[in-house]
Amino acid sequence: MLSVAILAAGKGTRMESSLPKVLHKISGKSLLQRVIDSCAELKPDKIFVITGHKSKEVQKSIPKDKKIHVVVQEPQSGTGHAIQVLCSEVKKHEGKLLVLNGDVPLIRPTTLKRLLYLHDSKNADVSLITTKKTNPHGYGRVFLNGDFIERIVEEKDCNELERENPLINAGVYCFNWGNLSEIINTLQSNNNQKEIYLTDTISLLKNSLSLEVEDNGELQGINNRIHLSECEECIQNSIKEKHMLNGVTFINKASCSISEEAEIGKDVIIEANTHIRGNTKINSHCIIGPNTFIENSNVGLQCEISNSTVYDSQVMDHIKIGPYSHIRPNSKISSYSKIGNFVEIKNSQLEEETKVNHLSYIGDSIIGRSTNIGAGTITANFDGQKKYQTKIGKNSSIGANTVFVAPINLGESVTTGAGSVITKDSKDNSLAISRTKQVNIENWKKKKS
Protein backbone atom coordinates (compact mmCIF):
# COMPACT_ATOMS: atom_id res chain seq x y z
CA MET A 1 0.00 0.00 0.00
CA LEU A 2 1.30 3.45 -0.94
CA SER A 3 0.13 6.74 0.55
CA VAL A 4 1.46 10.19 -0.37
CA ALA A 5 1.67 13.27 1.85
CA ILE A 6 2.18 16.61 0.10
CA LEU A 7 3.27 19.41 2.43
CA ALA A 8 1.41 22.56 1.38
CA ALA A 9 0.88 24.45 4.63
CA GLY A 10 3.67 27.04 4.53
CA LYS A 11 3.24 30.79 4.13
CA GLY A 12 5.92 31.23 1.47
CA THR A 13 6.85 34.66 2.81
CA ARG A 14 9.76 35.05 0.38
CA MET A 15 7.30 35.05 -2.52
CA GLU A 16 6.10 38.46 -1.27
CA SER A 17 2.55 37.57 -2.31
CA SER A 18 -0.96 37.40 -0.90
CA LEU A 19 -1.42 34.17 -2.89
CA PRO A 20 -0.34 30.94 -1.13
CA LYS A 21 2.98 29.83 -2.56
CA VAL A 22 1.73 26.47 -3.82
CA LEU A 23 -0.96 28.22 -5.90
CA HIS A 24 1.50 30.22 -7.99
CA LYS A 25 1.47 28.89 -11.54
CA ILE A 26 4.06 27.64 -13.98
CA SER A 27 2.92 27.25 -17.60
CA GLY A 28 -0.71 27.39 -16.57
CA LYS A 29 -0.61 24.91 -13.67
CA SER A 30 -0.14 25.62 -9.97
CA LEU A 31 2.92 24.29 -8.19
CA LEU A 32 0.66 22.07 -6.09
CA GLN A 33 -1.19 20.67 -9.11
CA ARG A 34 2.10 19.74 -10.76
CA VAL A 35 3.21 17.82 -7.68
CA ILE A 36 -0.19 16.09 -7.45
CA ASP A 37 0.06 15.11 -11.14
CA SER A 38 3.53 13.61 -10.66
CA CYS A 39 2.42 11.64 -7.62
CA ALA A 40 -0.73 10.42 -9.38
CA GLU A 41 1.46 8.57 -11.90
CA LEU A 42 2.64 6.35 -9.04
CA LYS A 43 -0.97 5.17 -8.65
CA PRO A 44 -1.04 5.62 -4.87
CA ASP A 45 -3.93 4.42 -2.75
CA LYS A 46 -4.29 7.83 -1.11
CA ILE A 47 -2.88 11.33 -1.51
CA PHE A 48 -2.98 13.59 1.55
CA VAL A 49 -2.55 17.32 0.95
CA ILE A 50 -1.54 18.99 4.21
CA THR A 51 -2.68 22.61 4.19
CA GLY A 52 -2.40 25.42 6.71
CA HIS A 53 -1.82 28.99 5.57
CA LYS A 54 -4.98 30.11 3.71
CA SER A 55 -6.18 26.53 3.80
CA LYS A 56 -9.60 27.23 2.28
CA GLU A 57 -8.04 28.93 -0.73
CA VAL A 58 -5.67 26.02 -1.27
CA GLN A 59 -8.47 23.47 -0.85
CA LYS A 60 -10.54 25.13 -3.59
CA SER A 61 -7.72 24.49 -6.06
CA ILE A 62 -7.44 20.77 -5.31
CA PRO A 63 -9.21 18.55 -7.86
CA LYS A 64 -12.10 16.47 -6.61
CA ASP A 65 -10.85 12.91 -6.43
CA LYS A 66 -11.72 10.08 -4.06
CA LYS A 67 -8.04 9.40 -3.52
CA ILE A 68 -7.19 12.97 -2.49
CA HIS A 69 -7.78 13.98 1.13
CA VAL A 70 -7.09 17.31 2.83
CA VAL A 71 -5.49 17.56 6.27
CA VAL A 72 -5.30 20.96 8.00
CA GLN A 73 -2.17 21.74 10.04
CA GLU A 74 -2.80 24.38 12.71
CA PRO A 75 -0.52 25.92 13.79
CA GLN A 76 2.24 25.43 11.22
CA SER A 77 5.05 24.21 13.47
CA GLY A 78 7.32 22.49 10.97
CA THR A 79 7.43 19.49 8.67
CA GLY A 80 7.58 17.00 11.52
CA HIS A 81 4.51 18.56 13.09
CA ALA A 82 2.68 18.23 9.76
CA ILE A 83 3.23 14.47 9.77
CA GLN A 84 2.27 14.30 13.45
CA VAL A 85 -1.07 15.87 12.51
CA LEU A 86 -1.47 13.44 9.60
CA CYS A 87 -0.74 10.39 11.76
CA SER A 88 -3.23 11.55 14.39
CA GLU A 89 -6.00 11.88 11.79
CA VAL A 90 -5.36 8.64 9.91
CA LYS A 91 -6.17 5.50 11.88
CA LYS A 92 -4.30 2.90 9.84
CA HIS A 93 -0.61 3.47 9.13
CA GLU A 94 -0.02 0.74 6.57
CA GLY A 95 2.57 0.28 3.84
CA LYS A 96 4.73 3.13 2.58
CA LEU A 97 4.29 6.87 3.10
CA LEU A 98 5.89 9.11 0.47
CA VAL A 99 6.38 12.66 1.77
CA LEU A 100 7.33 15.62 -0.40
CA ASN A 101 6.86 19.36 -0.56
CA GLY A 102 4.17 21.04 -2.62
CA ASP A 103 6.67 23.48 -4.12
CA VAL A 104 8.82 21.10 -6.22
CA PRO A 105 6.92 21.32 -9.53
CA LEU A 106 9.60 19.67 -11.69
CA ILE A 107 9.89 16.43 -9.72
CA ARG A 108 9.72 13.51 -12.13
CA PRO A 109 7.58 10.42 -11.56
CA THR A 110 10.54 8.32 -12.71
CA THR A 111 12.67 9.72 -9.88
CA LEU A 112 9.95 9.00 -7.34
CA LYS A 113 9.67 5.45 -8.68
CA ARG A 114 13.43 5.00 -8.23
CA LEU A 115 13.08 6.07 -4.59
CA LEU A 116 10.25 3.60 -4.00
CA TYR A 117 12.25 0.81 -5.63
CA LEU A 118 15.30 1.51 -3.43
CA HIS A 119 13.11 1.59 -0.34
CA ASP A 120 11.45 -1.74 -1.14
CA SER A 121 14.58 -3.55 -2.34
CA LYS A 122 16.55 -2.63 0.81
CA ASN A 123 13.62 -3.02 3.21
CA ALA A 124 14.41 0.44 4.57
CA ASP A 125 12.71 2.31 7.40
CA VAL A 126 13.21 5.57 5.51
CA SER A 127 14.72 6.46 2.16
CA LEU A 128 15.21 9.99 0.90
CA ILE A 129 16.46 11.81 -2.16
CA THR A 130 19.74 13.69 -1.91
CA THR A 131 21.83 15.64 -4.38
CA LYS A 132 25.09 17.57 -4.42
CA LYS A 133 24.99 21.31 -4.99
CA THR A 134 27.89 23.63 -5.69
CA ASN A 135 26.04 26.24 -3.65
CA PRO A 136 24.04 24.39 -0.99
CA HIS A 137 22.98 27.54 0.87
CA GLY A 138 19.51 27.22 2.36
CA TYR A 139 19.37 23.42 2.32
CA GLY A 140 19.70 20.86 5.09
CA ARG A 141 23.00 18.94 4.91
CA VAL A 142 23.01 15.14 4.80
CA PHE A 143 25.77 13.20 6.58
CA LEU A 144 26.39 9.57 5.66
CA ASN A 145 27.93 6.68 7.54
CA GLY A 146 28.79 4.21 4.83
CA ASP A 147 25.61 3.48 2.88
CA PHE A 148 23.37 4.81 5.63
CA ILE A 149 22.28 8.29 6.61
CA GLU A 150 23.63 9.26 9.99
CA ARG A 151 21.90 12.60 10.42
CA ILE A 152 20.51 15.67 8.65
CA VAL A 153 21.33 19.15 9.91
CA GLU A 154 19.21 22.09 8.79
CA GLU A 155 21.04 25.10 7.34
CA LYS A 156 20.30 27.39 10.28
CA ASP A 157 21.54 24.77 12.74
CA CYS A 158 24.80 24.00 10.88
CA ASN A 159 28.22 24.98 12.19
CA GLU A 160 30.90 26.28 9.81
CA LEU A 161 32.33 22.82 9.07
CA GLU A 162 28.90 21.27 8.45
CA ARG A 163 28.03 24.05 5.99
CA GLU A 164 30.86 22.91 3.71
CA ASN A 165 29.08 19.61 3.03
CA PRO A 166 27.60 19.78 -0.54
CA LEU A 167 25.21 16.81 -0.06
CA ILE A 168 21.77 18.23 0.62
CA ASN A 169 18.34 16.92 1.54
CA ALA A 170 15.87 17.34 -1.33
CA GLY A 171 12.88 17.02 1.00
CA VAL A 172 11.49 13.83 -0.59
CA TYR A 173 11.10 10.88 1.79
CA CYS A 174 9.72 7.36 1.69
CA PHE A 175 8.87 5.93 5.11
CA ASN A 176 7.72 2.61 6.45
CA TRP A 177 4.57 4.21 7.81
CA GLY A 178 4.11 1.78 10.66
CA ASN A 179 7.63 2.39 12.01
CA LEU A 180 7.27 6.14 11.47
CA SER A 181 4.03 6.31 13.44
CA GLU A 182 5.75 4.73 16.45
CA ILE A 183 8.36 7.49 16.78
CA ILE A 184 6.74 10.55 15.16
CA ASN A 185 5.31 11.94 18.40
CA THR A 186 8.71 11.84 20.12
CA LEU A 187 9.98 14.66 17.89
CA GLN A 188 10.57 17.96 19.65
CA SER A 189 11.39 21.54 18.65
CA ASN A 190 14.88 21.68 20.17
CA ASN A 191 16.43 23.82 17.42
CA ASN A 192 17.05 27.42 16.44
CA GLN A 193 13.80 27.61 14.51
CA LYS A 194 11.72 26.19 17.36
CA GLU A 195 10.04 23.92 14.82
CA ILE A 196 9.48 20.17 14.72
CA TYR A 197 11.69 18.82 11.93
CA LEU A 198 10.77 15.71 9.97
CA THR A 199 14.50 15.22 9.39
CA ASP A 200 14.92 14.33 13.08
CA THR A 201 13.27 10.97 12.32
CA ILE A 202 16.47 9.88 10.58
CA SER A 203 18.41 9.40 13.81
CA LEU A 204 15.45 7.54 15.35
CA LEU A 205 14.99 5.00 12.55
CA LYS A 206 17.49 2.19 12.07
CA ASN A 207 17.68 1.70 8.33
CA SER A 208 17.95 5.13 6.63
CA LEU A 209 19.03 5.18 2.98
CA SER A 210 19.92 7.88 0.46
CA LEU A 211 19.09 8.00 -3.25
CA GLU A 212 21.52 10.50 -4.71
CA VAL A 213 20.36 12.01 -7.99
CA GLU A 214 22.01 14.45 -10.35
CA ASP A 215 21.24 18.11 -9.69
CA ASN A 216 19.35 18.67 -12.95
CA GLY A 217 16.81 21.19 -11.73
CA GLU A 218 13.94 18.81 -10.99
CA LEU A 219 14.51 19.13 -7.24
CA GLN A 220 14.38 22.93 -7.24
CA GLY A 221 12.03 24.18 -4.57
CA ILE A 222 10.22 27.43 -5.27
CA ASN A 223 10.98 29.97 -2.57
CA ASN A 224 10.85 33.26 -4.49
CA ARG A 225 9.92 34.76 -7.86
CA ILE A 226 13.40 34.09 -9.23
CA HIS A 227 12.94 30.35 -8.64
CA LEU A 228 9.48 30.59 -10.19
CA SER A 229 10.89 32.21 -13.32
CA GLU A 230 13.70 29.66 -13.58
CA CYS A 231 11.25 26.76 -13.42
CA GLU A 232 8.98 28.42 -15.98
CA GLU A 233 11.93 28.77 -18.33
CA CYS A 234 12.93 25.14 -17.77
CA ILE A 235 9.45 23.85 -18.61
CA GLN A 236 9.06 26.16 -21.60
CA ASN A 237 12.41 25.10 -23.04
CA SER A 238 11.38 21.46 -22.77
CA ILE A 239 8.01 22.11 -24.45
CA LYS A 240 9.47 24.13 -27.32
CA GLU A 241 12.33 21.71 -27.93
CA LYS A 242 9.80 18.89 -28.27
CA HIS A 243 7.86 20.87 -30.88
CA MET A 244 10.99 21.88 -32.78
CA LEU A 245 12.05 18.25 -33.04
CA ASN A 246 8.58 17.54 -34.47
CA GLY A 247 8.93 20.14 -37.24
CA VAL A 248 7.88 23.48 -35.72
CA THR A 249 9.94 26.64 -36.29
CA PHE A 250 10.27 29.32 -33.62
CA ILE A 251 11.58 32.63 -34.93
CA ASN A 252 12.39 33.84 -31.41
CA LYS A 253 11.56 31.04 -29.01
CA ALA A 254 12.58 32.95 -25.89
CA SER A 255 9.75 35.43 -26.48
CA CYS A 256 7.07 32.75 -26.92
CA SER A 257 5.19 30.53 -24.48
CA ILE A 258 3.40 27.27 -25.28
CA SER A 259 1.12 25.27 -22.99
CA GLU A 260 1.90 21.62 -22.34
CA GLU A 261 -1.50 20.61 -23.74
CA ALA A 262 -1.04 22.44 -27.04
CA GLU A 263 -0.71 20.45 -30.27
CA ILE A 264 1.22 22.00 -33.15
CA GLY A 265 1.54 20.43 -36.60
CA LYS A 266 4.55 20.18 -38.87
CA ASP A 267 5.90 23.17 -40.79
CA VAL A 268 4.18 25.66 -38.51
CA ILE A 269 6.10 28.91 -38.01
CA ILE A 270 5.71 30.62 -34.65
CA GLU A 271 6.75 34.27 -34.85
CA ALA A 272 8.04 36.36 -31.94
CA ASN A 273 5.88 37.25 -28.93
CA THR A 274 3.33 34.54 -29.62
CA HIS A 275 1.57 32.76 -26.76
CA ILE A 276 -0.42 29.54 -27.19
CA ARG A 277 -2.39 28.52 -24.13
CA GLY A 278 -4.70 25.75 -22.96
CA ASN A 279 -6.01 22.98 -25.21
CA THR A 280 -5.11 24.65 -28.48
CA LYS A 281 -4.46 22.71 -31.67
CA ILE A 282 -2.67 24.30 -34.62
CA ASN A 283 -2.58 22.24 -37.79
CA SER A 284 0.24 22.10 -40.33
CA HIS A 285 1.68 24.89 -42.49
CA CYS A 286 0.36 27.80 -40.41
CA ILE A 287 2.13 31.06 -39.66
CA ILE A 288 1.22 32.29 -36.18
CA GLY A 289 2.32 35.72 -34.98
CA PRO A 290 4.02 37.93 -34.29
CA ASN A 291 2.31 39.33 -31.18
CA THR A 292 -0.50 36.77 -31.14
CA PHE A 293 -2.40 35.06 -28.31
CA ILE A 294 -4.42 31.87 -28.90
CA GLU A 295 -6.22 30.00 -26.11
CA ASN A 296 -8.34 26.82 -26.16
CA SER A 297 -8.89 27.07 -29.91
CA ASN A 298 -8.53 24.94 -33.04
CA VAL A 299 -6.65 26.41 -36.00
CA GLY A 300 -6.87 24.58 -39.32
CA LEU A 301 -4.41 24.03 -42.16
CA GLN A 302 -2.42 26.85 -43.77
CA CYS A 303 -3.78 29.70 -41.67
CA GLU A 304 -2.09 33.01 -40.99
CA ILE A 305 -2.83 34.83 -37.74
CA SER A 306 -0.86 37.96 -36.91
CA ASN A 307 -1.05 40.53 -34.11
CA SER A 308 -4.38 39.09 -32.97
CA THR A 309 -6.13 37.18 -30.18
CA VAL A 310 -8.26 34.05 -30.50
CA TYR A 311 -10.19 32.59 -27.54
CA ASP A 312 -12.23 29.37 -27.36
CA SER A 313 -13.01 29.34 -31.07
CA GLN A 314 -12.64 27.34 -34.28
CA VAL A 315 -10.58 28.70 -37.15
CA MET A 316 -10.89 26.35 -40.12
CA ASP A 317 -8.49 25.92 -43.10
CA HIS A 318 -6.81 28.59 -45.28
CA ILE A 319 -7.86 31.59 -43.20
CA LYS A 320 -6.12 34.92 -42.68
CA ILE A 321 -6.70 36.81 -39.45
CA GLY A 322 -5.24 40.17 -38.53
CA PRO A 323 -3.57 42.36 -37.85
CA TYR A 324 -5.33 43.50 -34.68
CA SER A 325 -8.30 41.15 -34.81
CA HIS A 326 -10.09 39.82 -31.73
CA ILE A 327 -11.85 36.46 -32.04
CA ARG A 328 -13.88 35.98 -28.88
CA PRO A 329 -15.35 32.73 -27.46
CA ASN A 330 -17.76 30.45 -29.33
CA SER A 331 -16.89 31.72 -32.78
CA LYS A 332 -16.35 29.65 -35.91
CA ILE A 333 -14.52 31.07 -38.90
CA SER A 334 -15.01 28.75 -41.87
CA SER A 335 -12.43 27.99 -44.56
CA TYR A 336 -11.04 30.56 -47.01
CA SER A 337 -12.38 33.48 -44.99
CA LYS A 338 -10.57 36.70 -44.13
CA ILE A 339 -10.76 38.65 -40.88
CA GLY A 340 -8.89 41.93 -41.27
CA ASN A 341 -7.60 44.75 -39.12
CA PHE A 342 -9.52 45.99 -36.10
CA VAL A 343 -12.31 43.42 -36.40
CA GLU A 344 -14.02 41.80 -33.41
CA ILE A 345 -15.97 38.55 -33.76
CA LYS A 346 -18.00 37.21 -30.81
CA ASN A 347 -20.17 34.09 -30.56
CA SER A 348 -20.67 34.06 -34.32
CA GLN A 349 -20.47 31.68 -37.25
CA LEU A 350 -18.94 32.85 -40.52
CA GLU A 351 -19.37 30.44 -43.42
CA GLU A 352 -16.80 29.78 -46.17
CA GLU A 353 -15.18 32.61 -48.14
CA THR A 354 -16.61 35.35 -45.95
CA LYS A 355 -14.66 38.59 -45.69
CA VAL A 356 -14.72 41.05 -42.81
CA ASN A 357 -11.78 43.22 -43.75
CA HIS A 358 -11.92 46.37 -41.64
CA LEU A 359 -13.14 48.01 -38.46
CA SER A 360 -16.20 45.88 -37.73
CA TYR A 361 -18.02 44.20 -34.83
CA ILE A 362 -19.83 40.94 -35.54
CA GLY A 363 -21.57 39.58 -32.45
CA ASP A 364 -24.14 36.78 -32.02
CA SER A 365 -24.40 36.43 -35.79
CA ILE A 366 -24.56 33.86 -38.57
CA ILE A 367 -23.00 35.07 -41.82
CA GLY A 368 -23.58 33.03 -44.99
CA ARG A 369 -20.82 31.96 -47.36
CA SER A 370 -19.17 34.30 -49.85
CA THR A 371 -20.52 37.37 -48.09
CA ASN A 372 -18.52 40.60 -47.97
CA ILE A 373 -18.87 42.75 -44.87
CA GLY A 374 -17.95 46.38 -45.56
CA ALA A 375 -15.81 48.54 -43.32
CA GLY A 376 -17.43 49.83 -40.16
CA THR A 377 -20.25 47.27 -40.04
CA ILE A 378 -21.83 46.78 -36.62
CA THR A 379 -24.29 44.16 -35.42
CA ALA A 380 -26.13 45.93 -32.59
CA ASN A 381 -27.06 42.86 -30.58
CA PHE A 382 -27.88 44.19 -27.09
CA ASP A 383 -30.94 46.14 -25.99
CA GLY A 384 -29.75 46.67 -22.45
CA GLN A 385 -31.28 43.46 -21.11
CA LYS A 386 -30.99 40.74 -23.73
CA LYS A 387 -28.79 39.87 -26.69
CA TYR A 388 -30.26 39.07 -30.11
CA GLN A 389 -29.03 37.35 -33.26
CA THR A 390 -28.29 38.72 -36.72
CA LYS A 391 -28.54 36.38 -39.74
CA ILE A 392 -27.17 37.31 -43.16
CA GLY A 393 -27.61 34.93 -46.10
CA LYS A 394 -24.90 33.82 -48.52
CA ASN A 395 -23.52 35.93 -51.38
CA SER A 396 -24.56 39.16 -49.69
CA SER A 397 -22.78 42.50 -49.94
CA ILE A 398 -22.89 44.70 -46.88
CA GLY A 399 -22.12 48.35 -47.48
CA ALA A 400 -19.66 50.30 -45.39
CA ASN A 401 -20.87 51.66 -42.06
CA THR A 402 -24.00 49.50 -41.95
CA VAL A 403 -25.62 48.95 -38.55
CA PHE A 404 -27.87 45.92 -38.03
CA VAL A 405 -30.29 46.30 -35.12
CA ALA A 406 -30.94 42.71 -34.01
CA PRO A 407 -32.95 40.54 -34.06
CA ILE A 408 -32.83 40.65 -37.84
CA ASN A 409 -32.78 38.16 -40.71
CA LEU A 410 -31.47 38.97 -44.19
CA GLY A 411 -31.96 36.55 -47.07
CA GLU A 412 -29.44 35.46 -49.68
CA SER A 413 -27.73 37.86 -52.10
CA VAL A 414 -28.87 40.91 -50.15
CA THR A 415 -27.15 44.26 -50.62
CA THR A 416 -27.20 47.06 -48.07
CA GLY A 417 -26.48 50.68 -48.85
CA ALA A 418 -23.51 52.30 -47.19
CA GLY A 419 -24.40 54.13 -44.01
CA SER A 420 -27.69 52.30 -43.52
CA VAL A 421 -29.30 51.39 -40.21
CA ILE A 422 -31.12 48.13 -40.93
CA THR A 423 -33.98 47.34 -38.55
CA LYS A 424 -36.22 45.10 -40.69
CA ASP A 425 -35.80 41.69 -42.32
CA SER A 426 -34.94 41.60 -46.04
CA LYS A 427 -35.82 38.96 -48.63
CA ASP A 428 -33.47 37.28 -51.12
CA ASN A 429 -31.96 39.42 -53.88
CA SER A 430 -33.08 42.69 -52.32
CA LEU A 431 -31.45 46.04 -51.64
CA ALA A 432 -31.86 47.31 -48.09
CA ILE A 433 -31.17 50.99 -47.62
CA SER A 434 -32.11 53.29 -44.79
CA ARG A 435 -30.79 56.83 -44.69
CA THR A 436 -32.15 60.35 -44.99
CA LYS A 437 -32.00 62.27 -48.24
CA GLN A 438 -28.93 64.46 -48.51
CA VAL A 439 -29.62 68.18 -48.39
CA ASN A 440 -27.07 70.71 -49.69
CA ILE A 441 -27.46 74.27 -48.39
CA GLU A 442 -25.58 76.73 -50.54
CA ASN A 443 -23.68 79.76 -49.23
CA TRP A 444 -23.59 78.30 -45.73
CA LYS A 445 -21.87 80.50 -43.21
CA LYS A 446 -19.96 78.85 -40.40
CA LYS A 447 -20.68 80.06 -36.90
CA LYS A 448 -17.90 82.21 -35.50
CA SER A 449 -16.39 81.13 -32.23
Curated annotation (Swiss-Prot):
Residue ranges, annotated region (Linker): 226-246
Keywords from the named record: Acyltransferase, Cell shape, Cell wall biogenesis/degradation, Cytoplasm, Magnesium, Metal-binding, Multifunctional enzyme, Nucleotidyltransferase, Peptidoglycan synthesis, Repeat, Transferase
Top enzyme class: transferase
Chain positions recorded as Mg(2+) binding sites: 103, 223
Cofactor: Mg(2+)
Keyword DNA damage: no
GO molecular function, one term: magnesium ion binding
Catalytic activity: alpha-D-glucosamine 1-phosphate + acetyl-CoA = N-acetyl-alpha-D-glucosamine 1-phosphate + CoA + H(+); N-acetyl-alpha-D-glucosamine 1-phosphate + UTP + H(+) = UDP-N-acetyl-alpha-D-glucosamine + diphosphate
Cofactor binding note: Binds 1 Mg(2+) ion per subunit.
EC nos: 2.7.7.23, 2.3.1.157
Region (Pyrophosphorylase): 1-225
Subunit-level organization: Homotrimer.
Recorded family membership: In the N-terminal section; belongs to the N-acetylglucosamine-1-phosphate uridyltransferase family. In the C-terminal section; belongs to the transferase hexapeptide repeat family.
Annotated protein name in UniProt: Bifunctional protein GlmU
Native source species: Prochlorococcus marinus (strain AS9601)
